[in-house]
Amino acid sequence: MERVNGEDIWQDREIRFDVDHKLLRLINGEIQVAKIEHVEDTKGNNGDRGTMRVTNLRLIWHAASMPRINITIGWNAITGVQSKQTTSLVTRNRGISNEAIYVLAKVSATTTKFEFIFTTTNPASHSKLFNTISSISRAYETTKMYRELKMRGVFIREDGTLKILPQETIIEKVNGVWNLSTETGSLGVFVITNIRVVWYAEMNIGYNVSVPYITLYSVRVRESKFGMALVLETTTSSGEYVLGFRVDPAERLQNLLKTVQSLHKAHLLKPIFGVSYVKEIAEKVEPRKDDDEIDIIDNNEDDVEIDDKIRPDAFASYFDGEHTATDEKQLPVLNPELGLAIEPIRNGFTLHDLWNIHVDV
């Protein structure tokens, strides 16, 4: 069978601004849960209305007037969701305040924090959006076994059986499989399901590993100091692990290789991310449809793209400084250069930095 290499899925892990419209399309396994029109990005584009899409992997917002202004926020980056009173530019002149959704996020492996504020035009839309975001966020947090490699976990029962996940089916159980991660190797059991491969030691079920197909870069057989072995390599975002397993005889090893490669390929075509959402009767989950993916973006490219390539730094617009979810923001102070009271500028930044315009070349 032809070997198929997996790819890093960034959609649920990263925060990106103003991406190409192709990157806003739903990927395999991504499901649109809700679509709310007339949602204002109050912090970064105050006064500009747009569309918010909630999927099982991320939040997607784009401006209605210029779809190239957009945000994609992966659930793995979101650290908190709150509902607060705020005043948007649209309603400020009428003296009206709205409930807004505050999304707190953090870039993985860094201390950089972001704060996003989204405001809807009516209470019904706000409630629907807030409830959906909160529910999907909780669902994502509680289903990491579908998407992350786990070692020495508690997914094996005392009797040596695997704790099955929802939507998971055991395909094959193989005894007498050696894990080659130690000098002498450890004898154990290999369990193959439609979602992952699991190995655990016969003498110690706490010594185990669970490898979802979504984390796999490649599956192959190659030479090791123990002889020919089944080698699982994980993607960069999954730690780039190289896991070796040996099973005899060679024919049995080849059959194991074909089974895992086949399931890996099938899972890449239709991944199971584990994030589910029970909608109300009046609502309807919208799965991926090619015809629907394009409607959020104008695909007609203009000859002149100056307006599309110039935008104030999106990073600075949403940068949350050193505030935590419970911190109170500092009161405004007088800035002599402007003659106005402004929020204190964070250490390391200047007034000039805040006015600087970044041009993509």
Curated annotation (Swiss-Prot):
Keyword presence, 4Fe-4S: no
Compartments in which it is found: Cell projection, Cilium membrane; Cytoplasm; Cytoplasm, Cytoskeleton, Cilium basal body; Cytoplasm, Cytoskeleton, Microtubule organizing center, Centrosome, Centriolar satellite
GO MF, one annotated term: phosphatidylinositol-3-phosphate binding
Phenotype caused by lack of the gene: Single mutants do not display any obvious defects in ciliogenesis. Double bbs-5 and bbs-4 mutants display a defect in cilia structure and function. This is characterized by increased accumulation and mislocalization of intraflagellar transport proteins and impaired movement of intraflagellar transport proteins along the ciliary axoneme. Double mutants also have defective polycystin-mediated cilia signaling and mislocalized and increased accumulation of mechanosensory receptors pkd-2, osm-9 and odr-10 within cilia.
Gene Ontology biological process terms in this record: cilium assembly; intracellular transport; protein transport
Domain of life the protein comes from: Eukaryota
One cellular component (GO) term of this entry: non-motile cilium
Record's keyword terms, sorted: Cell membrane, Cell projection, Cilium, Cilium biogenesis/degradation, Cytoplasm, Cytoskeleton, Membrane, Protein transport, Transport
PANTHER family, A to Z: BARDET-BIEDL SYNDROME 5 PROTEIN, BARDET-BIEDL SYNDROME PROTEIN 5
Function: Component of the BBSome complex. The BBSome complex is thought to function as a coat complex required for sorting of specific membrane proteins to the primary cilia. The BBSome complex is required for ciliogenesis but is dispensable for centriolar satellite function. Required for BBSome complex ciliary localization but not for the proper complex assembly. Required, redundantly with bbs-4, for cilia biogenesis and both the assembly and movement of intraflagellar transport proteins along the ciliary axoneme. Plays a role in the removal of degraded mechanosensory receptors within the cilia.
Family in the record: Belongs to the BBS5 family.
Assembly and oligomerization: Part of BBSome complex, that contains at least bbs-1, bbs-2, bbs-4, bbs-5, osm-12, bbs-8/ttc-8 and bbs-9. Interacts with bbs-4 (via C-terminus); the interaction is direct.
Full protein name: BBSome complex member bbs-5
